[in-house]
Amino acid sequence: MASGVGAACEELPPDGTCDECEPDEAPGAEEVCRDCGFCYCRRHADAHRQKFLSHRLAAYVHGAQAWTPPASGGDDALPEDAEAKGEAEGEVESEVGEEESETEVDSESEEESETEEDSEDESDEESEEDSEEEMEDEQESEAEEDNQEEGESEAEGETEAESEFDPEIEMEAERVAKRKCPDHGLDLSTYCQEDRQLICVLCPVIGAHRGHQLSTLDEAFEELRSKDSGGLKAAMIELVERLKFKSSDPKVTRDQMKIFIQQEFKKVQKVIADEEQKALHLVDIQEAMATAHVTEILADIQSHMDRLMTQMAQAKEQLDTSNESAEPKAEGDEEGPSGASEEEDT
């Protein structure tokens, strides 16, 4: 068979491409088999080497003889061929062992590098997680501080707003201002009958109410309360009767009826305004009376406290004087027994 292969190789010299690949897609030959004479690329050379362990592969050189015929010589040639085959097989096995050891070393080094990279990645991830947790804790603490500050500022703002815009405080301030005379700043303790207004004690003396008829708060309150409040009721009854009479007159036009209604309601509105003013006067007078009453009570309490303070001061002075008078007597008593003892000794 070797002779047949050699004859084929002599008839068909190698063209420099891989004999196993497709002719149209065959790459350049890199190795050649010395036993069978075929040229191979890198991939097919490795496959041929693994399949035929006894074949000898060498680097392909263009123009060189690809096939080396076996030496003829009968029985003498057989040992040489066996030795050559054994050497080739040993070389192939050694090459395969070296390749396997290299692949094992490479795989071990790759595994070690992968484990190192994994450990580094894990440490990096842990450090990143720790840093993220620290950042989150810091952000939470900052947010809590900001919330506390905002709550305090809001509470302060609410208290300030309540103190500034509390309607009860404003109403109380208005009441206090109404209880004082706008001209003199004194309590409103007198009532002007002509102007129907509360005034202080200085208004009829040096103010705008000089020469006016005055009355006390109690008198003004009783007078306003005793007045008949049936004026509004009488005005309403009179309005209804006039409207009936006017509407029954066929000579009255619609425009005249509108004018009449407006005039009558103006009269009723005036009566209502008078009643409203009367009620407001009653409230103001009653409030002024309460203020005056409270003022009188406070004045009585203050005078009583002044009397008590005076009595306490007098009692303290008497106690001090009695203590001062008692001190010389005690000194005389102490000197008396000592002088008597001295006389007895003499």
From Swiss-Prot:
Tagged with keyword Zinc-finger: yes
Pfam families: zf-B_box (PF00643)
ZnF start-end (B box-type): 176-217
This protein's UniProt keywords: Coiled coil, Metal-binding, Phosphoprotein, Zinc, Zinc-finger
Residues at which Zn(2+) binds: C181, H184, C203, H209
Organ and tissue specificity: Expressed mainly in brain with high level in cerebral hemispheres and cerebellum. Lower expression in kidney, lung and spleen. In brain is detected in the hippocampus, thalamic and pretectal nuclei, substantia nigra, the dorsal part of the medulla, the cerebellum, in the olfactory nucleus, other cortical areas apart from hippocampus and the striatum. Indeed expression is confined in neuronal somata namely in the CA3 region and dentate gyrus of the hippocampus, caudate-putamen, parabranchial nucleus, olfactory nucleus, cortex, deep cerebellar nuclei and thalamus.
InterPro entries per record: TRIM/RBCC, Znf_B-box
Keyword Repeat: no
Disordered: annotated segments: 68-167, 313-346
Biased composition range(s): Acidic residues: 89-167, 332-346
Modified residues (Phosphoserine): S338, S341
PROSITE patterns: ZF_BBOX
GO molecular function ontology, one term from the record: zinc ion binding
Coiled coil: 292-327
Description of how the protein assembles with itself and partners: Interacts (via coiled coil) with TRIM17 (via coiled coil).
Protein role: May play a role in the process of differentiation and maturation of neuronal cells. May regulate the activity of TRIM17. Is a negative regulator of PAX6 expression.
Protein known as: Tripartite motif-containing protein 44
Species, as recorded: Mus musculus (Mouse)
Lineage: Eukaryota, Metazoa, Chordata, Craniata, Vertebrata
